[in-house]
Amino acid sequence: MKRIWFAVVALSAVLLFGGNQTSHAQQGMIDLSQWTPPDIGVVGDDPFGKLVKYGHELFTNTANEIGPAVADVSKRLAGNNLACQNCHLHAGTQPYAMPLTGVWGQFPQYRAREGMVEILEERINGCMERSVNGRALALQSREMRAFSSYLRWLSTGVPDGAKLLGAGTLQDQGAGTAG
């Protein structure tokens, strides 16, 4: 009888505690392929909304806004005609295509390439200098505030530090290569 009682108690503990570990892990996971990004069309015209809209414009039309042929020489911050969304598809919302949904809550983070912990604005400048062959943005510039406001807005509803299924690329996920 003691063996049966022990087995019932042990099985109950495994089901109670072991099952919760799985559900807790799943609760912290967000599948970006099932995620609906916020709608840029409903962003307000308050100061934050204006920065979000400008950030979206910078992100989707980088060369037209800050590229090498912009009429205002002081705005020539990017050194080529790429747009941010050439790498981060669909304005940074496409799963498995280096999406930026939820990235706001992933920083600061350790960056192996730089060998240090970076804030989001430093990572943005990494893209500015390497990917678009441009100049680093001043941390308090309108452009930097717009980029970071856009990324903050894009992360609306994603808990800080959430595990994001679909972040990175297909190759990063071990699911093959991006096609």
Each predicted region: which residue ranges?
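Short cysteine/histidine-rich metal-coordination sites, predominantly Zn2+-binding motifs
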Residues: 74-75, 100-109
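Helix-coil boundary and N-terminal low-complexity module in membrane systems
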Residues: 62-65, 80, 91, 97-102
